[in-house]
Amino acid sequence: MNLHEYQGKQLFAEYGLPVSKGFAVDTPEEAAEACDKIGGSEWVVKAQVHAGGRGKAGGVKLVKSKEDAKAFAQQWLGKNLVTYQTDANGQPVSKILVESCTDIDKELYLGAVVDRSSRRIVFMASTEGGVDIEKVAHDTPEKILKATIDPLVGAQPYQGRELAFQLGLKGDQIKQFTHIFVGLAKLFQDYDLALLEVNPLVIKKDGNLHCLDAKINIDSNALYRQPKLRAMHDPSQDDAREAHAQKWELNYVALEGNIGCMVNGAGLAMGTMDIVNLHGGKPANFLDVGGGATKERVTEAFKIILSDSNVKAVLVNIFGGIVRCDMIAEGIIGAVKEVGVKVPVVVRLEGNNAELGAKVLAESGLNIIAATSLTDAAQQVVKAAEGK
């Protein structure tokens, strides 16, 4: 689950980290009022969406009057912002962050992720702030500095000082950076985060450090014990199909192809997508119905897949282990009848009661194509999607 920038900065402030004075507003009038509350003669207004690249898309602007702030809010509230990280429809803007202007001398990067290979939180810092850190890591990996956090003792001040020295910070800046580093590490652990970024972490003209942005991603598996963060969830930023899938405990990720995939097991689902791609097809989604594939869940899975107008054929690939193939077959038949599936459906069943499942499908009288192997299934569904 992602947080908006203004929500991330609220958490930063709770941990005593330096952030700009600002207000998240819902109306143009509130945007003008926020300028009065903040004071000064210049403000930064930012459209709040769960995507990067807002500046290039016109979603961030420096304004010099309350009227300009109001006009910016009128321009974006209720509209969709399209950036290089969104799809063609963009993300809806329901809040605008109005904050004080910061005099920037230099931009740095500071972030943290859970590194699965070392099973530790790893902090990364760089002198290349304000740009895409993935590009920096690819083009100039030597500019990425790292500090690994021991889970038994947490982030230590000496690690912060070490990074500060390597970033070329001096004097009181080292103390400030260490404070930010330790605070972010505590925030990361306290709230079960999966990713945290301050990009850019800036050195102001007066020499002080300042967190100019906040990107936070929470481990969704830990949300049950993070009620405060759960309450910050903005459903308007979710893909409608993915939100529907979540209600039914289906793992769904929308893609850009035309072949819908319904599979039990994440590994098998990825393998299915690979083999579809190998035979010239393009998967429209990743969908794992899991081990408890009931008729109801299969029906909902079909509804989700077919809500994508790009889908021209559906491949159902089930390995019967925990779940019986004959039960899945009955679920598929019931779902096809209930949903009124108009596109070709290719089914490959293997494992527990696979032969019985194939028999049930054959006797259903429905236009369901039975595949004899995974390769056959991929070839059949690609042909079906092409209308052959």
Curated annotation (Swiss-Prot):
Cofactor: Mg(2+)
Catalysed transformations (reactions): succinate + ATP + CoA = succinyl-CoA + ADP + phosphate; GTP + succinate + CoA = succinyl-CoA + GDP + phosphate
GO cellular component assignments: cytosol; succinate-CoA ligase complex
Taxonomy, superkingdom: Bacteria
Keyword match Ligase: yes
Chain positions recorded as Mg(2+) binding sites: 199, 213
Pfam families associated with the record: ATP-grasp_2 (PF08442), Ligase_CoA (PF00549)
Molecular-function GO terms, alphabetical: ATP binding; magnesium ion binding; nucleoside diphosphate kinase activity; succinate-CoA ligase (ADP-forming) activity; succinate-CoA ligase (GDP-forming) activity
Cofactor note: Binds 1 Mg(2+) ion per subunit.
Binding site for ATP: 46, 53-55, 99, 102, 107
Pathway listed: Carbohydrate metabolism; tricarboxylic acid cycle; succinate from succinyl-CoA (ligase route): step 1/1
InterPro entries assigned to the protein according to its UniProt record, in alphabetical order: ATP-grasp, ATP-grasp_succ-CoA_synth-type, ATP_grasp_subdomain_1, Succ-CoA_synthase_bsu_CS, SUCC_ACL_C, Succ_CoA_ligase-like_bsu, Succinyl-CoA_synth-like
GO BP terms: nucleoside triphosphate biosynthetic process; succinyl-CoA metabolic process; tricarboxylic acid cycle
Binding annotation for substrate: 264, 321-323
Similarity-based family: Belongs to the succinate/malate CoA ligase beta subunit family.
Protein name: Succinate--CoA ligase [ADP-forming] subunit beta
